């Protein structure tokens, strides 16, 4: 695939218009706003940046690389193992529902669009529950997107959804949100670099230590007033 074609595929996959429901989740951000941990643009940006560097970069991003490599080699056993591992690390009902729903929606879209070979689509369709990183990595392989570029799109899409949630729930202005997203570019790149290093180790150095995220997600389940599903 030419670089330009790969770029267009990346833009398609990272688009907010992709019908997988990312706009309906905040991954604990709304609960952080409710208790006052996040209260303005500065604290929202710090929250999202720290989540990238200390949560995504240490677990989900390196695991995404392992899933991409599994799909690339059509090592279905490895894909299933890492998919199950990631699902087991979702500490609350809301976080499990989020990755299951978005993963299922993207896997269904891959089949409907006819992306990738028959074997990839068939194996993806029968993984249940299929987590979002598993489905996104499979889609990148199907669209011939390299692992670093695919992971950058995955992380940027995550950051963009977080900024959109902050705009609605803090609330913030649209321009403030764009300034925030622009300043997060470097954090996305740092997340990719850290993930590459962690995925290269034997065994891969994955850490799920994020107790505040689990507590906030649990709190969000009974939050009185909320806009988001997580």
From Swiss-Prot:
Does Membrane show up as a keyword for this record?
no
Name a GO molecular-function annotation.
nickel cation binding
- Cited Pfam families: UreF
Q: Which Gene3D superfamilies match?
A: Urease accessory protein UreF (1.10.4190.10)
- Recorded superkingdom: Bacteria
Principal localisation? cytoplasm
**Which compartments is it annotated to reside in?**
Cytoplasm
Keyword annotations for this protein, in alphabetical order, are: Chaperone, Cytoplasm, Nickel insertion
> InterPro entries given for it?
UreF (IPR002639), UreF_sf (IPR038277)
Give Gene Ontology CC terms.
cytoplasm
User: What's this chain's function?
Assistant: Required for maturation of urease via the functional incorporation of the urease nickel metallocenter.
Provide the family line.
Belongs to the UreF family.
PANTHER family given in the database record = UREASE ACCESSORY PROTEIN F
What subunit structure does UniProt give? UreD, UreF and UreG form a complex that acts as a GTP-hydrolysis-dependent molecular chaperone, activating the urease apoprotein by helping to assemble the nickel containing metallocenter of UreC. The UreE protein probably delivers the nickel.
Q: What is this protein called?
A: Urease accessory protein UreF
Q: Encoded by which gene?
A: ureF
